[in-house]
Amino acid sequence: MGEGVTAPAVGQRVAAGSIVGAWAEYFLARAAAVVPVPDAIDDDVACQLMAMPLSAMMALEELGVRPDQWMIQNAATGAVGKTLAMIAKARGVHVVNVVRRSAGVAELAALGIGNAVSSAEAGWQKRVEAMTGGAPIVAALDSVGGEESGQLLHLLGEGGQLMTFGAMANQPMIVDPGDLIFKRKGFWAAKLGSGPRRAEIPRAIGEIVRLAATGELKLTVEKAYPLEEAAEAARASMQPGRTGKIAFRA
């Protein structure tokens, strides 16, 4: 504890994010930048609280989807996708979860995430329309790019908005101008954590901690490595098709 620091208490578990040099048994962090972790949250979940869950929540709030409305996202088996689906469910927002392989549907179901469809299967767009029962999809989160951007945009209802969050396909977005011109759909790139929304981060973190403590937010670790195996852990983190995060256990 630094001079003049009175909280958190010595021995209190905390979570921290955006710390340079954190691949170590010990590191320094500002007291104001750490979040106390309640006993109901284990270490595997606690180590993930300050990264993807916060990004997912801020993206959901930027989209402004209200309870009982529908949105759609791709890359739904990714950390952001799974977290957004769970947070949205807790808020009463319906999410269509698009995955790129059929096994991903079962992976999401094991976490209690429904409304999943594989874009590898023919006619998946028709299945999306059946899921929503004809209700308009008001927002989309695109983490892939390429042709999948246009696929999401096409499924949006009139006046719907698409947020581009990532570019897993490493390709430019391919969209139909007709969706933009005649159906008044639009899109923008996400730059979260700055501007007016930044002031809402403490409240968002509080909600994330609460959802994790109640089990409504499940954050899985596929494998934890000792620090001595950092190189192997880094290689494992780059492998596609993982079902959880790669972590260190000191």
Regions found by a protein language model. Give the residues of each.
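A glycine-/small-residue-rich N-terminal strand-loop-strand element
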Residues: M1-I19
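C-terminal hydrophobic helical "lid"/dimerization subdomain
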Residues: A199-A250
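Mid-domain Rossmann-like dinucleotide-binding core that forms the NAD(H)/NADP(H) cofactor-binding site
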Residues: C47-E121
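Glycine-rich phosphate-binding loop and adjacent beta-alpha segment
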Residues: V99, L108, E147-E216
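NAD(P)H cofactor-binding loop motif with strongest signal on the N-terminal glycine-rich segment
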Residues: A75-A76, V144, A167
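Short amphipathic alpha-helix with an adjacent loop that forms part of the alpha/beta core around
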Residues: G123-G134
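Short helix-loop-beta connector
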Residues: A9, D39-D44, G64-W70, G134-P136
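A structural motif shared across PLP-dependent enzymes of the aminotransferase-like
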Residues: S18-A31
